């Protein structure tokens, strides 16, 4: 996918150099919400090597939002899920404190939606936690519909589940 500049933020595919910055943003979010518990992405084995994980298969993608000075502001991706057919999971949408007021989450989500559609997926699935209330509001504004907890949930500590047709 080509780079896409939206105001002063560029959304682009992940590089290996982004890995430590993304891992720090993700861990910081879990620490701020006191969710450093098993059953969350905080303990995902690929967290320090997201570039390798998302580039391992052609129907995955991961994107970073970068400010004018090159600072990584946020991240979001998608990968296959066994929860539903022809469905990708929107994964690891996290923002730095500086990005939370710039609508970066919306921009990343929309980029991921288009990339998942381009990869042939028909639906996006999200699992999140009720403590991530700003993310829940964003998902609902983007048209995701809350569903009951499906079978095969990857992160057992999550308590909110959503679907959106692409």
Explain the meaning of each model-derived region:
Residues 34, 38, 62, 102, ...:
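Short linear functional motifs in flexible/disordered or boundary regions
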Residues 32, 122-166:
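C-terminal "cap" of GNAT-fold acetyltransferases
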Residues 71, 88, 96-110, 117-119, ...:
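Conserved glycine-rich acetyl-CoA-binding loop
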Residues 37, 65, 85, 105, ...:
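Residue-level detector of alpha-helical recognition elements and their boundaries
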Residues 4, 9, 13-91, 96-97, ...:
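Acetyl-CoA-dependent GNAT
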